[in-house]
């Protein structure tokens, strides 16, 4: 794979996948779980009441990527399938839910939510730009290589999600405390690096090929 794709391009693509993996949270049912947020949504007539507690944002994100015409996800079909699988598995949940547990956005607010989703996606793409995602043929032609690539990216995604959700790894500073996004990201990188160093994880690496 290393010889089939530029390493810096692959890094950008993995960063982008990690950055957008929670796009499925841009849904009124998920956001409405928090009482305060639901009241705010109600004020803008963007809320959607439901009795279902089975909504899974990672599965909804997979559905969103299927409908690429809605927000312009840029990948060839084969690579798109891999990315959908990675994102749908990042919480390792058993799929024992019924079809009705998947909550479509109601027609009267679906267009406005679609615009919100596009805005979030485009904002992520602006901060973490990457070329069209087209994994090399060897990923699809060799099952062992495909397995390693898919699970390698999934592992990076799960680790990054854990770090971003870890109160010990992240301080309380938000983007509002900085003059621009670049300064914010530079600061967070320093904070996370210090945390990982303290956990003896900065020297971790894949074993050499034998």
Predicted feature descriptions by range:
Residues 199-210:
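N-terminal pre-P-loop "Q-motif" helix
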